Amino acid sequence: MTLKINTVAPDFKAKTQLGDISFHEWLGDSWGVLFSHPKDFTPVCTTELGALAKMKPEFDARNVKVIGLSVDPVDDHVKWLDDITDVCGMKPEYPIIADEDLAVAKLYNMLEDDAGVTSGGRTAVDNETVRTVYVIRPDKRIGLFLTYPMTTGRNFHEILRAIDSMQRTIKHQIATPADWKPGEKVIIVPKVSNDEAKKIYPDGWETIKPYLRKVPDPHK
């Protein structure tokens, strides 16, 4: 199945270093970030998991659960956590899926169906497409996905910014402009008429074009 924005994120059962999970049950009513990496004990991925460990309180504050994935076994995850702690100064406290049979990677379009059924003997290059971020909304639908080359570390501040934008859209019927940061002006979505906007924003708005109306960030 091809996954797109607004598709229901496929459910699955998996092993992690923190125990077995059923994905949708684990998510509950929270937002979710599912991010994958090609292989444990690799340089870029080590820095990424460490960076996310440091930023986890920011995600927690937004009701976002984070979960990693690679096709390595649980034992490798556990050993690798020591390296991440040593390099980055903080141990990841979020689950990391051990997708040894490649099932979740295939389910989420990270590997082709003919990639085999075991991670044994696979190198980081074999798994280079296992390098995706999915942001999943509380309705279990995909809100965003990004795929990176294995040589480019992910910017989790940007992922957090995108979540801030999506959460505001759901709550306040607004969109965010290019290069927007929390606290900056936002855009009233076109489907909200001027009459409706007056009820939501009684103090008015800045009209740049009839279709481009800006208001202060309503998030408190």
PLM segments and residue spans:
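Chalcogenol-based redox active-site neighborhoods
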Residues: 1-220
